[in-house]
Amino acid sequence: MNPAHLLVLAAVCVSLLGASSVPPRPLNLINFQRMIQCTTRRSAWDFTNYGCYCGAGGSGTPVDELDRCCKVHDDCYGAAEKYHRCSPKLTLYTSTCSSQTGSVTCKDNGTKCKAFVCNCDRTAALCFGRAPYNKNNENINPNRCR
């Protein structure tokens, strides 16, 4: 085999091995991230470890209005799974953002699941836009969430 071909094959194998250790990002979270940035003008990463409910999981009593937005969003995703038999984190939909007004619109997505999930994300993103962001509630002690 040609040495150049071997080099390319080795590079592909190494890149695949490296990629296998990176967990795939749920596709819908990209849509939700865009909505959050539209309504808050903040990075969606600002909300990944906020309070008791923003980010993965959630328990206890929400620490403030923004954290309540996240709990409502979690509950909405639960309803999507239960009543619409869909996987919200994997459901792709179409929406538009007006960066001038901070408004988000869900487009006709063709299925009840897509429409429901888009509305879950839209409602949460608008709630994030209205709620104050308190830096003291970033990376809080998990004991506060019991």
Swiss-Prot record:
CDD domains per UniProt: PLA2c (cd00125)
PROSITE patterns from the UniProt entry: PA2_ASP (PS00119), PA2_HIS (PS00118)
Cofactors (names): Ca(2+)
Molecular functions per Gene Ontology: calcium ion binding; calcium-dependent phospholipase A2 activity; phospholipid binding; toxin activity
Disulphides: C38-C97, C52-C145, C54-C70, C69-C127, C76-C120, C86-C113, C106-C118
One Pfam family in the UniProt entry: Phospholip_A2_1
Signal peptide: 1-21
Entry superkingdom: Eukaryota
Positions of the propeptide segment: 22-27
Chief localisation class: secreted
Catalytic residues (UniProt): H73, D121
Gene3D superfamilies: Phospholipase A2 domain (1.20.90.10)
A GO biological process held by the record: lipid catabolic process
EC number assigned by the record: 3.1.1.4
Cell compartment(s), UniProt: Secreted
Keywords recorded for this protein, A-Z: Calcium, Disulfide bond, Glycoprotein, Hydrolase, Lipid degradation, Lipid metabolism, Metal-binding, Secreted, Signal, Toxin
SUPFAM superfamilies xrefs: Phospholipase A2, PLA2
Residues bearing attached sugar chains per UniProt: N109
Catalytic reaction(s) noted: a 1,2-diacyl-sn-glycero-3-phosphocholine + H2O = a 1-acyl-sn-glycero-3-phosphocholine + a fatty acid + H(+)
Binding site for Ca(2+): Y53, G55, G57, D74
Purpose: PLA2 catalyzes the calcium-dependent hydrolysis of the 2-acyl groups in 3-sn-phosphoglycerides.
Name of the protein described by the UniProt record: Basic phospholipase A2
UniProt organism field: Micrurus corallinus (Brazilian coral snake)
Lineage: Eukaryota, Metazoa, Chordata, Craniata, Vertebrata
